[in-house]
C-alpha cells in the first residue's frame, strides 16, 4: 500500500511538472532562441 502511494505521488508530480513545463515552453516556442529546451 505504501509503494502504491509512492507510485501515485510520483505519477502526479510527473504530470504536473510536465504540464507546467509544456505551458511555460509554449511561450518559448514562439521565441527563436530556445536555450531552455536544450
UniProtKB/Swiss-Prot annotation:
One BP annotation, GO: photosynthesis
Subcellular location(s) of the protein: Plastid, Chloroplast thylakoid membrane
Record carries keyword Ion transport: no
Keywords per UniProt: Chloroplast, Membrane, Photosynthesis, Photosystem II, Plastid, Reaction center, Thylakoid, Transmembrane, Transmembrane helix
Protein's membrane topology: Single-pass membrane protein
Pfam families linked to this entry: PsbI (PF02532)
Stretches that traverse the bilayer: 6-25
Top-level taxon of origin: Eukaryota
Cellular compartments per GO CC: chloroplast thylakoid membrane; photosystem II reaction center
InterPro entries, A to Z: PSII_PsbI (IPR003686), PSII_PsbI_sf (IPR037271)
Purpose: One of the components of the core complex of photosystem II (PSII), required for its stability and/or assembly. PSII is a light-driven water:plastoquinone oxidoreductase that uses light energy to abstract electrons from H(2)O, generating O(2) and a proton gradient subsequently used for ATP formation. It consists of a core antenna complex that captures photons, and an electron transfer chain that converts photonic excitation into a charge separation.
NCBIfam families, A to Z: PRK02655.1
Complex and partners: PSII is composed of 1 copy each of membrane proteins PsbA, PsbB, PsbC, PsbD, PsbE, PsbF, PsbH, PsbI, PsbJ, PsbK, PsbL, PsbM, PsbT, PsbX, PsbY, PsbZ, Psb30/Ycf12, at least 3 peripheral proteins of the oxygen-evolving complex and a large number of cofactors. It forms dimeric complexes.
Entry similarity comment: Belongs to the PsbI family.
The protein's name in its UniProt record: Photosystem II reaction center protein I
Organism, scientific name: Guillardia theta
Gene that specifies this protein: psbI
